[in-house]
Each structure stands twice: as structure tokens, then as C-alpha cells.
Amino acid sequence: MTPVGLDITDAEGVAQVAGQCTDVSLLVNNAGVLKYSPFISAPSLDAARAEMETNYFGTLSMCRAFAPLLAANGGGAIVNMLSVTSFYTNVIDASYAASKAAAWSLTNGIRLELHPQGTLVVGVHAGFIDTDMAAPATNVPKDSPESVAEQTFDAVEAGQVEVLADERTRTVKAQLSRDQELIYPPIQKFLDDALKGGS
């Protein structure tokens, strides 16, 4: 495996890297941007645009660039790093959640589109992972990068299309059919209590 440093919002850079990696059999889309931005009270749309450009459009660009190479090499696999917030939205990271929900939809869509060429497409959903991006989030449980990586490669090896990397993520996914009953009321109560405490 060869890690590649790349701005995935740079179309020319993506094309250049794809041209250098013609023997690829596994693409891991791990680039991400998290701005901790709400929808309405954010000062501008800049954070939302940055998150969508990287987390959705950048991931899409990588998949488009590498899909033909994977096909030429027997199918291979694409891994998209998603999030528990693919499944629900909070206020503090609302626009990030929207970008990850879009990336989840993208992942499910390209899985269908690339099935005929034999490409496995894996979506990895996790809560906070103990990386620099999650450093501002304190007093919350975090997954180790090693645990998420191990689960991801086990899934690729087994041909599984989804990884739910921690108990929180598994619980939220299981509650999706009752999200307005089970997921959002506790979030709303937390926000309401925080507002009362700050007044």
C-alpha cells in the first residue's frame, strides 16, 4: 500500500496521481474536512462549501479517476471513510454531517454502478477517531485508528460492503427507522438544556 498526499479537490492533481498509480487494486478515500459549523448561525457558507468540496466532490473525483484502473486490474476495491454523522445531524457539525450523508449516498450509488466490473465498494462509518481532525472534540469516546483500519481491511478481505466501527455507530444505524423518536429527541434535549444553562 502506498499512502499519497493529495488535495483531492484539485482535478489536475487527482488525474496526475491516477496516472502514476496504474497498478492500483485498492483505493482508500480517507481525506476529510471538519469545520464544526452549524447551518443557520454560521457566518457564511464557506465551511459548508469546503466540507462538501472535499468530503463529497473530492471523493467522487477520486472514484471517477480510479474506477477504470481498478477495472483494468481485475476489479479491486474502493473504501470510503464516512461517519456516524452520515446517519444523523447535530448542530455543532451540521454541514459536515450533510457532506457525509452525501458521501454515504455516493458510496451506495457507485457500489451499484461498479458492480459489473467487480469492484467492491466499502463504506466505513465511525464516531470520533483519535486523529488530529478530532482533537478539538474533548471528553468524548474516540476509536483508535488501528481498530478502524483493522476492521476495514477485514471487511475488504471478507467482501463486506459496510463497517460500523464502534458501538455508538452500530446503535445509531439500528435506530434509523425510528430516528425522529430515538435519535433526535435526546439531541434536542441536550441543546435545550445547554441553552437554559447559558441563560
Where are these regions (language model features)?
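Active-site helix of classical SDR
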Residues: 63, 99
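Residue(s) in the substrate-gating loop at a strand-loop-helix junction
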Residues: 83
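Conserved mid-core segment of classical short-chain dehydrogenase/reductases
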Residues: 34-49, 92-95
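The beta1-alpha1 cofactor-binding region of Rossmann-like NAD(H)/NADP(H)-dependent oxidoreductases
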Residues: 5-16, 45
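Active-site-adjacent segment of SDR/Rossmann-fold oxidoreductases
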Residues: 88, 109-120
